[in-house]
Amino acid sequence: MTGNEVWFDAAKYLHQNKIAKPVMWLGDDRHYKKAKDIFSDDVLFMDTFVHYQENINQINYIDEKSEFFFSGNYLRAKDRCLKMMDRLDLYGSFSRQDREVVFNKISLFLLKKLSKEKPDALVMAEIAHSHAQYLVLEICMFLNIEIVKFNTWILGPLLYLESLQTGKRFEVDFEV
């Protein structure tokens, strides 16, 4: 959840130049209002997924990609996400069962949303470091959705996309 303006500007540029259209924006909440103005209903409030899952309503999940719950992706995501949720439990009042309910609720929401929207790729500005971000990553891997991450090179003003699955860098003919 980087608050850097450059990541918002990159998404805005891709959208305005009809290179990419977000089907789900789950970015830093500092950009929420600006992103909502540009990307409309495709913008989700990150705090809802990380801290206030009770605000996720009307999932209307039937059985979209229910085989996810029997996959290695589910088991890996559950193990890692439940551990990531430990960081949110300041007072020790969040039981294992509570964590599993939250994890499965977010899973159902994401499976419904990603099955309906059928995105071409998951584009990340950074490696997932919250349970919600990591769950999106695992579900996209399960659905065979291309996952790319922006990388920067410290020695020069270089920004490039790299596939998380293959490590391949994408060549783009682009002048600044």
Model features per residue range: what roles?
Residues 9, 34, 135:
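Phosphate- and divalent-cation-binding pockets in alpha/beta enzyme and binding domains
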Residues 1-16:
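Charged, amphipathic alpha-helical stretches
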Residues 7, 80-82, 118-121:
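Generic detector of bulky aromatic hydrophobic side chains
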Residues 3, 103, 129:
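Charged, low-complexity surface patches
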Residues 109-173:
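Conserved nucleotide-sugar donor-interacting segment of glycosyltransferase catalytic cores
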Residues 1-4, 27, 123-126:
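Nucleotide-activated donor-dependent transferases that construct or modify glycoconjugates
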Residues 5, 30, 130-131:
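Short alpha-helical
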Residues 13-110, 152-176:
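Conserved N-terminal ligand/cofactor-binding loop architecture of enzyme catalytic domains
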